[in-house]
Amino acid sequence: MKQTKNARKAGFTLVEIMIVVAIIGLLAAIAIPNFVKARATSQANACINNLRQIDAAINQWALELHQTTGAGPASLSSDLTPYIKLNASGSIPQCPASGTYTTATVGSTPQVTCSLGNTVTPGHFLP
């Protein structure tokens, strides 16, 4: 069967496919860092909200038990459980970025800290 001069095979040329792949690569190079940054920001915000909730629970615990400034730190696992909203598994909220929370003496600033603190951006600390 003879092909005419103007007849063309169906499909994409190599150049067209390379252009599409380059565009997809460029979009991925722009989008992926933004997704990573959004995830880190979301984790930091969740951690800060947990710190606020634990800080409020420490204040409630200290008021109810007449603890004065400088009193020993409250235990996250036993002392604060009645004063804090537990997560779905029935435990104290945890840092979503795998940090650990530590309580300090009553009235200190801050009363609760995350082990990640300023080591990550954005930071996991109470403003």
Model-predicted regions and their roles:
Residues 1-12:
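N-terminal leader/signal peptides at the extreme start of proteins
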Residues 36-51:
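Aliphatic-rich helix starts adjacent to a transmembrane/signal segment
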Residues 8, 19, 31, 43, ...:
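Conserved Rossmann-like nucleotide-binding pocket used by diverse enzymes
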Residues 13, 17, 52, 56:
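Catalytic phosphate/metal-binding cores of nucleic-acid and nucleotide-processing enzymes, i.e., regions
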Residues 18-34:
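Alpha-helical hydrophobic helix detector
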Residues 56-127:
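Extracellular/periplasmic head regions of type IV pilus-like filament subunits
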Residues 31, 39, 59-62:
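Protein kinase-like catalytic domain
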Residues 21, 48, 55:
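Conserved catalytic core of two-component sensor histidine kinases
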